[in-house]
Curated annotation (Swiss-Prot):
Name of the featured protein: Probable nucleolar GTP-binding protein 1
Pfam families the record matches: NOG1, NOG1_N, NOGCT
PROSITE patterns the record matches: G_OBG
Domain of life: Eukaryota
Keyword Nucleotide-binding: yes
Record GO biological process: assembly of large subunit precursor of preribosome; ribosomal large subunit biogenesis; ribosomal subunit export from nucleus
Organism: Schizosaccharomyces pombe (strain 972 / ATCC 24843) (Fission yeast)
Length: 642
């Protein structure tokens, strides 16, 4: 359907947005780094790629606009004329042709500058050529400002047009303004057309839908038409003329005999005869509306004669209605639908396609064996059966009556098993067997299992009362008692050791090396004595190791060396340690110079701390542009690192 295509047109951007989209896409989708030291062929290819990519993007955008807009020569004549009335066919074609011309100009500019880039001898000249090419393309697009704005307005209006199918079953409502066309449409369809007591409330085509005989129908409410030449009709009236001229439908011509619409009966009859050529080969229904105010029988002689000129036409059917009091509204709809269905069937029978179908249809009729008539036989019981009456006490009781008597829906549970047809009626209410792996579960269920379980529970309680499960074994061996006592003391000691270790760890102290915690011989002896262990052998072993170390030192040197070493040792012990001056105070003599020096040191450390330097000698240069953050480009499905 063309109207569905109208609603799918992509929004058209203005000039500035168009250029922003194109240039930003070029910047994102093409390389951005080039150096003057690269090969000239690489530089030419770099800028040539940018020019070509920009031209491709502009061409793609303009092509999508040109392809999405409907071609007036290819769509239905109704939609083509409607677009001509609403937007002017020539204006629309000129706007589209200007975009097509701009597309070709952009292609020519890109072709010329790519040829010039092949002769660029430096990065600067190639860059200037690229800049000139993109500038000329942007200038060409900027000149299409008015065309893009006009096409965007047309697109917005097209998307709001009603979805009119020119090939489906259609009822077309027409007539003078304010004769009740929109009121009738609101009655027979789900549309909500604005109805006001003044003329030209409806200024465009409105569509409503309804179902009749399981078929989908559409009703088109047209704006009011005035009786004047076609050249003098405005856009609102021309929409109605276009619909009547091109849509194959049933035309409902509404007349207001009460003249409350502001137009006389004679004017309405004259308008009918003026637009009668548009009703050729169409089903025409004359709808006399507002009969609650004026009926045809109450008209004067002159108006009745004028009305009769329309009725005398053999192709016109007359229906009376009143939308205010809902008189004859459905009759109008039924009459129009039946007439249109018959006309469509008749038209299809006149076509050539029906012969292809009729040749394959054969109606089989039984051959008469004699002259005896054998009509359909209807039993007397069926003929005498009375119609069901809910108020009849002797009526047949239905399932609905049983449900209502037992609480209604949601309360009463319908018993469906009483309708089962089985060999034995007693089987109706048997429970359905539960099958598992092709076997009936009921066959494997012990009916006495609950009684057996109860007997087992009673026996268990009896054994517990008698002390059957109580243990008679007691520990009477003294050795076993001693072992158990030692084991309990060991477990208690391990627990205390673990707690002490935990308390030691939670103290906020630095962890010292193993050598810093060396204990003396006296501490070792005291700990062994407290544990009840001998310590004499430990002391003797320590003294022997000390004597062995001293003898080794004497064996390494001569006696003179030993005497010298002993003299040096005595002399070193007699010399007092040399006093050391505070290095922070050296070189600072004046009062207040210390605080100034500290303040100056802090100032000098600011830069080092900000640059995350370890010290003054830290000269490490970190990466100015981390490659894992700045390398790669996401585009065309290619990804490097990121």
């Amino acid at each position: 359907m063309a109207t569905a295509v109208f609603k799918n047109i992509t929004p058209i951007p203005d000039v500035n947005t168009f250029l922003d989209v194109v240039l930003s896409r070029t910047q994102r989708k093409t390389p951005t780094v080039i150096r003057s030291g690269f090969k000239i062929s690489r530089i030419r290819g770099f800028y040539g790629r940018k020019v070509k990519f920009t031209q491709d993007t502009i061409t793609e955008k303009l092509d999508s606009i040109l392809q999405e807009f409907p071609k007036l020569n290819d769509i239905h004549p109704f939609h083509a004329d409607l677009l001509n009335i609403l937007y002017d066919r020539d204006h629309l074609k000129i706007a589209l042709s200007q975009l097509s011309t701009a597309k070709h100009l952009v292609e020519n500019v890109a072709r010329d500058y790519i040829r010039l880039l092949k002769y660029g001898d430096s990065l600067y000249r190639c860059k200037q050529l690229k800049r000139a090419a993109l500038g000329r393309m942007a200038t060409i697009i900027k000149r299409q400002k008015s065309s893009l704005e006009f096409l965007e307005q047309v697109r917005q209006h097209l998307s709001r047009l009603p979805a009119i199918d020119p090939n489906t079953r259609t009822l077309l409502v027409c007539g003078y303004p304010n004769v009740g066309k929109s009121s009738f449409m609101n009655k027979v369809t789900r549309a909500q057309v604005d109805v006001q007591p003044y003329a030209f409330t409806t200024k465009s085509l409105f569509v409503g839908h309804f179902d009749y005989k399981y078929l989908r129908w559409q009703v088109i409410d047209t704006p009011g038409i005035l009786d004047h030449p076609l050249e003098q009709m405005n856009t609102i009236e021309m929409q109605s003329i276009t619909a009547m001229a091109h849509l194959r439908s049933a035309v409902l011509y509404f007349m207001d005999l009460s003249e409350m619409c502001g137009y006389s009966v004679a004017a309405q009859v004259k308008l009918y005869h003026s637009i009668k050529p548009l009703f050729a080969n169409k089903v025409t229904i004359l709808v006399l509306n507002k009969i609650d105010a004026m009926r045809p029988e109450d008209l004067d002689q002159k108006n009745q004669e004028l009305l009769q000129t329309i009725i005398d036409d053999g192709n016109v059917k007359v229906v009376q209605t009143s939308c205010v009091q809902d008189i004859g509204v459905m009759d109008v709809r039924t009459t129009a639908c039946e007439a249109l269905l018959a006309a469509r069937v008749e038209q299809k029978l006149k076509g050539s396609r029906v012969n292809n179908v009729l040749n394959r249809i054969h109606l089989a009729e039984p051959a008469a064996r004699d002259e005896v008539a054998r009509p359909a036989c209807i039993p007397d019981s069926v003929k005498t059966r009375r119609a069901y009456d809910a108020n009849d006490p002797n009526r047949r009781i239905l399932a609905r009556d049983i449900e209502a008597a037992n609480g209604g829906a949601g309360v009463y549970n319908v018993e469906l098993r009483d309708k089962y047809i089985l060999q034995d009626p007693s089987w109706k209410y048997d429970r359905m067997p539960e099958l598992l792996d092709g076997k009936n579960v009921a066959d494997f269920v012990d009916p006495e299992i609950e009684a057996k379980l109860l007997a087992l529970d009673e026996e268990e309680e009896r054994l517990e009362r008698e002390g059957y499960y109580d243990s008679d074994q007691e520990i009477e061996d003294a050795d076993e008692e001693e072992v158990l006592e030692k084991a309990s003391r060991i477990r208690e000691k391990n627990k205390l050791t673990m707690l002490a270790a935990r308390q030691k760890k939670i103290k906020n102290r630095p962890v010292l090396p193993r050598t810093a915690g060396i204990r003396t011989l006296d501490e070792l002896q005291s700990s062994l004595q407290s544990a009840g262990l001998p310590s004499d052998s430990i002391e003797e072993r320590a003294r022997s190791r000390a004597r062995t170390a001293a003898a080794n030192e004497m064996a390494d040197g001569s006696g003179v060396d030993l005497l010298m070493n002993e003299g040096e040792e005595i002399r070193s012990k007699s010399i007092a340690p040399r006093s050391q001056s505070n290095r922070r105070e050296s070189g600072v003599h004046a009062e207040g110079a210390r605080s100034y020096a500290d303040r100056l040191a802090r100032v000098k450390q600011i830069h080092r701390n900000r640059m995350a330097r370890a010290s003054e000698s830290d000269r490490h240069v970190i990466a100015a542009k981390p490659k894992h953050l700045l390398s790669g480009k996401r585009g065309n499905g290619k990804t490097q690192r990121r």
